[in-house]
From Swiss-Prot:
It comes from Buchnera aphidicola subsp. Acyrthosiphon pisum (strain Tuc7). The active site is at 57 (nucleophile). PANTHER family: PSEUDOURIDYLATE SYNTHASE, TRNA PSEUDOURIDINE SYNTHASE-LIKE 1. This is tRNA pseudouridine synthase A. Coiled coil: none annotated. GO terms for biological process: tRNA pseudouridine synthesis. Keywords: Isomerase, tRNA processing.
């Protein structure tokens, strides 16, 4: 796009990933990126390409996705939120919009990304949350899960928790927060890192579930991390329990937060 009169906008986006084959645009199946770009292009009256903070997989949800795009269109601020939402299905919504400096980049400007994984831990399944939570009927020992999770804090080689087809050049990531707690019949895993490998969060959760059902001995997560071998870890937890809840940026960008991020993610 020619630099003259180009504006850069950041948008906060939430979506129910149950209806899409992930974030990334694909040729045949529906994607969140495609739907958003279509809606933005209608408002701008020219083709819009967007960049996101984190490319979520099929079935993964978000209340904190951040995207940016560039445009030569001169529109009211509300056109990029209310206007765009009028062309989106009810399971995708723009929740805030802000004009940013041209050097802002949704992916590369991000400092950390935070995810929440929610498990419905009850003997009987839920009819309401089938596509929103992962149901585990066996009682989970949350204290054990949280204890083992602390071995993953800090900068490590997370080869044991990356997908076999992960294309990242380096397996090293820095986890700054990893908490496991129970709220009635819900078990929640909160995790924050500079960035994540493909399936990293779901592979960590899958391994912590094995700890929670007492299938593995104490310090297993520590040993697993040191092995650097995916084949020794637990199964990948289902996508439906995973939410991208917050992306942190330098304060000078002054980006808004989702209205209920502070409630949903502590």
């Amino acid at each position: 796009m020619v630099a003259k009169n180009v504006k850069t906008f950041a948008l906060g986006v939430e979506y129910d990933g149950s209806y899409y084959h992930g974030w990334q645009r694909q040729k045949i199946v529906p994607s969140i990126q495609e739907e958003i770009e279509k809606a933005l292009s209608i408002i701008a009256n020219h083709k819009i390409d967007v960049v996101c903070a984190g490319r979520t997989d099929a079935g993964v949800h978000s209340i904190g996705q951040v995207i940016h795009f560039k445009t030569t269109a001169n529109r009211k601020k509300s056109s990029w939120s209310i206007g765009v939402n009028s062309y989106l299905s009810e399971n995708i919504s723009v929740v805030w919009v802000k004009e940013v400096t041209e050097n802002f980049h949704a992916r590369y400007s991000a400092i950390t990304r935070s995810y929440r994984y929610i498990i419905y831990n009850y003997s009987l399944r839920s009819a309401i949350f089938q596509t929103k939570l992962n149901h585990i009927y066996r009682k989970l020992n949350v204290d054990k899960m949280h204890f083992e999770a602390q071995f993953l804090l800090g900068e490590h080689d997370f080869t044991s928790f990356r997908a076999l087809g992960c294309q990242s050049h380096s397996p090293w990531r820095n986890i700054t927060k990893l908490n496991v707690f129970r709220f009635h019949n819900w078990v929640v895993v909160d995790i924050t890192a500079n960035s994540f490998l493909h399936h990293m969060v779901r592979n960590i959760v899958g391994s912590l579930i094995e700890v929670g059902i007492s299938k593995k001995k104490e310090y297993w997560i520590k040993d697993l991390l040191e092995k650097k071998d995916r084949s020794h870890a637990g199964a990948t937890a289902p996508a439906k329990g995973l939410y991208l809840v917050y992306v942190e940026y330098p304060l000078h960008f002054n980006l808004p937060r989702s209205a209920y991020t502070s409630i949903f993610f502590k």
